[in-house]
């Protein structure tokens, strides 16, 4: 099953280090254009990008995927919609960083019973808050454009 396979790769370290991936050399062959590929399932990418969630940031990942950021931003916009009328994405980023959104989000989490120490992840939290504001004020395309600018895998592949 896919999730068990992911867990095995996570535990073996092959998501973090290219050399940890086990490739069966007996299933090696060349394509018509001379490229070496391996059989046996799965794809080894041309550009290896280590899995970005280092041990210890699982809580932040879970939090960002929980929908809590979405609800928080919705409530912020519901209370202050006029403040954001006509704002650009760049000005929105400045507003998120200069405003009290990080502390307000921590309070919002605590009220919901979630107690995470986010101080070491403040920049990431602010980034995800900014992205969610962009999604709710603009559209999904603007949201994903913003996320992809900070996506390590996308950036590494584009730099090749």
Label the predicted regions.
Residues 2-160:
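Conserved functional hotspot residues or short segments at active or partner-binding sites
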